[in-house]
Amino acid sequence: MSDYEIRRPSHVNDIASIVYDLSQMLIEPGENVPSGIYQWCGLQPLTKYDMVKSMAKVFNLDGNHVKGVKEPSPGAPRPFDTTMDTSRLEDLNISHHTPFEKGIEECLQKWRN
């Protein structure tokens, strides 16, 4: 399991809230009318291995059988770090971040025993 490339997972509810906030600014325009491209990513830098460990915790599983690999993943080249520049949204005071462990617990809740 890759413990090398950095991901910045975003919760779908955070993305929905950002889209809502931007649309509200278009419906009720003030001095900041959004236009152009906006980027978003989660705050937590995580590898796939980190995410699997969080999922194991949600299911109360050991997870020690999964081993992290500290080298680039084989196959198609992937960026080392997927962090995006979120400053345009932050300049509009738009910022929604669900911690990964909380978000993954919510998403996987129906599969828990």
Q: Where does each model-flagged region fall?
A:
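Substrate-positioning beta->alpha
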Residues: 2-25
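Residue-level detector of secondary-structure transition/capping positions
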Residues: 23, 59, 97, 111-112
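Conserved C-terminal active-site "lid" loop/helix of NAD(P)H-dependent oxidoreductases
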Residues: 37, 47-49, 53, 69-107, ...
